[in-house]
Curated annotation (Swiss-Prot):
NCBIfam families referenced in this protein's UniProt entry, alphabetically: adk, PRK00279.1-2, PRK00279.1-3, PRK14527.1
Gene that this sequence comes from: adk
Key words, A-Z: ATP-binding, Cytoplasm, Kinase, Metal-binding, Nucleotide biosynthesis, Nucleotide-binding, Transferase, Zinc
Pathway it works in: Purine metabolism; AMP biosynthesis via salvage pathway; AMP from ADP: step 1/1
Residues forming coiled coils: none
Complexes and interactors: Monomer.
Residues that coordinate or bind Zn(2+): C130, C133, C150, C153
Superkingdom: Bacteria
Full protein name: Adenylate kinase
Residues involved in AMP binding: T31, R36, A57, L58, V59, G85, F86, P87, R88, Q92, R160, R171
UniProt-annotated location(s): Cytoplasm
The reaction(s) this protein catalyses: AMP + ATP = 2 ADP
Residues that hold ATP according to the record: G10, A11, G12, K13, G14, T15, R127, G199
Amino acid sequence: MNLILLGPPGAGKGTQAKLLIKRFQIPQISTGDILRAAVSEMTPMGVKAKGYMESGALVPDEVVVGIVRERLEKNDCLNGFILDGFPRTVAQADALKHMLVCMNMSIEHVVSMAVDKEELLQRITGRRTCRLCGKGYHVVFDPPRVSGRCDECLGELFQRDDDQEETMRKRLDVYEDQTAPLITYYENESLLRSIAGVGSIDDIQQRILSIIQGTHG
């Protein structure tokens, strides 16, 4: 099963991917993780990426695609994979398609998790993290027993810069500009299935499974 999960920041892609990994015993491939690993291992593409990163430049698509290919060639991807954070643009999607053809592989499912912008803002801006132990909370959905203090160590809770409303709105704007066109791209490829990314974690997981198992209407 070769799957792409699409959705804006805060849609819950990471949470759903973890459940799918456990169920299907396939790897979740995060471009951030594999980029760092390729640089650390000094793979051919990792060496190229290192040069761009050290100069402060964006790593070009052809290098990112090459690093994805290096990862997909590993044995743990033989039974499938979940792509997380890639592709981000139509150009990357096109490059991925042609790369997979060369590898005699293809994407089987593209699941788009739709969540209202205000819901996303509430999810993200409500996050709080303990400065001492790193435990996460949410002011609405998972509040601490004592406001502003960690249940475990009584450390101060803080809001990460990435979780502040202004930053989050900018991230959502970038998603709309760059990544949302992927929805049209994969619709044209007859691969896209959209689900509501709201409700319980189990409810959302069942919607994804119904697509994978061919029972989604």
